[in-house]
Amino acid sequence: MAENQQRVLIASHRGRFSGNIVENTLPAFETAIRSGADIVETDIHLTRDNVMILFHDPTPLRLLGLPGKVSDYTLEELRACRLKNVIGEPSDWHINTLEEFLRAMKGRVMINLDQCWGFMDQVYDLVEKMGMEDQALIKGRAPYDEAVTWAKNRHWKPKFIPIIAGDKEIPLFEALPKEMDIPIVEVFLTGDEDKLISPDFVAGLKHRGIKLWVNSLSLGSGIDLSAHHDDDVSVTDAPEKGWGWLIDHGVEVIQTDWPSELRRYLDRIGK
């Protein structure tokens, strides 16, 4: 990430998916890269035959029309179905494995691997096998005990992104061992005066060389991660009210569903 230290980074949520391009597929990640993403985020599940696949939901109903859980099916059974596109019609795409994803992304962008703590050793054994330790980012929620214990048992230091969901969790973040590799901190914002976006907190992160990550995702009514400075207001009203506000308050990584629009805005303002 050294070459990107001076600019705002774009994290593309599940790749760039729209129309017939389905979330968490190689076409979605290729599209995200072409749209200007610096980081691509994906979710991982295990199949019944212990294959790591790219999939967000615990159930395959929404994208594959299958009942039960993802873990009820083998990779072959899941790949027998075509993924549904954004209007619920079968697309031309099928589920991808984590290994396929890593091969496609190697040497190109940072990768944020999500929803995989239950089989983290398996994930990072593959990351290590493919020589992608410097590209991989893993998030964790407070109190972070699992991440600390796991990191101590590795012979290389995983890049860990602590998630701080409220100012009461700041002491837990500050208590993390200094030897942990923490390039980024993700925060959930509840309002414009949130302590997690205060000048003092942001300055403290900068002093440690840690970037501040906020999700500008608009995930549905009642779900707010950015104090309403989100994708919706940025693309339907004015980016200055959404992405611009976050940047003005020290945010250096924005996770979005609109990477190309955010890239154009960043280019326009020189960020």
Residue ranges of predicted features:
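Phosphate-group recognition and catalysis centered on beta-loop-alpha active-site segments
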Residues: 1-271
